[in-house]
Amino acid sequence: MYKPQQQQQLFDLQDNNGAAFDNGGTDPSCWLSHENEISRTDSSLSSSNVDPLLFNDLVQIVPLVQSLIDRKEKSSFTRRGSMTYTKMPSRESLYKKTSEVKGRNAGQSTATKKHRDQNKNVSSSQDGYAENFSTPSSTSSLTEKDREELMTLREKVEDLQKKLLEKDELLKEAEILKNEITATNAELDEMKKDISEKDFLVKTTQVQLSDALVKLADKKAAVEKLEWEAMTSSKKVERLQEDLDLLQGEISSFIQFVHALTGNDSRDSAEECNVIPYPWDQNVEIDKLNERDLQKMEAAREAYIAAVAAAKENPDEASLSAASTARSYLQSLVLRT
């Protein structure tokens, strides 16, 4: 609550401000001349039960009103504004208001910040503070020019707000575009990485394909060599077959010739048996010798046929050599006989 001394100081401060206003607001130091008194009043209020925020709000209103009156005079107002004082509030209302202000912790900081901003932007908050005081003479004396200026200012403010909103939208779009570009760059880097890996894989595959082609060429050459060897072996087998056929013909002819000789010898021996009583043993030895040679020749022929058959199935050097050896042995037997 207000003490009598504090109330008197507050009214003295208001009287001094009113006197400054009555002088037309031409003395810019009228407010500065009372700074010491305000500071003393503020220090005295801080030691009392009065809320200092409420008192500071009341004190800050005074220079705003003074600046409003100065502005109205400078805009070709010939009539000076006068300040109307309201009735001093009662103790109960002040106590109630003080209690409400103390209970609003968040509201106090917001109100303080708001009044500080209003001190910095006096021109934008003059109408709000002028409504708290009754200045009918100032508001009623607005000219058409001031209204036009006010409308122009409002239009400019609206245009500025629209431009600000447009810029905000542009900034948001730019931010979205920036994010999209960042995401696109990330995807591009990922694609480049994938392409590099695929290029490496393609190069590796090409190297492997080249090695496979070289191996295939080697195998093709080996196959051609085997085909040539097989063709050569086939030719050798054909020659051996021809020789075998020729030899078989010769052997057949020789066997027929031997059988013919054997038949003639048998007949001659039979005739001689009738005439000569003792040539039987010699003929028996000749027959035995002929049968032994025939058995050797038959065995050599069968061995040669088997060697030729083995050479046909597996035409290698060993089988061909065995067939040639069997043939030579058979020829030697035939020629020796």
UniProtKB/Swiss-Prot annotation:
Subunit structure: Interacts with KN-1. Binds to tobacco mosaic virus movement protein (TMV-MP) at microtubules.
InterPro entries with a match to the protein in the record: MBP2C
Coiled-coil blocks: 143-194, 223-250, 294-314
Family the UniProt entry places it in: Belongs to the microtubule binding protein 2C family.
Comp. bias intervals (Basic and acidic residues): 89-103
Superkingdom assignment: Eukaryota
Name of the molecule in the record: Protein MICROTUBULE BINDING PROTEIN 2C
Compositional bias ranges of the Polar residues kind: 120-142
Gene Ontology cellular component list: cytoplasm; microtubule cytoskeleton
Gene Ontology terms: biological process: defense response; negative regulation of protein transport; plasmodesmata-mediated intercellular transport; positive regulation of defense response to virus by host; regulation of cytoskeleton organization; transport of virus in host, cell to cell
Molecular function terms from GO: microtubule binding; RNA binding
UniProt keywords, alphabetically: Coiled coil, Cytoplasm, Cytoskeleton, Host-virus interaction, Plant defense, RNA-binding
Tissue note: Constitutively expressed in leaves.
Subcellular location field: Cytoplasm, Cytoskeleton
Species of origin: Nicotiana tabacum (Common tobacco)
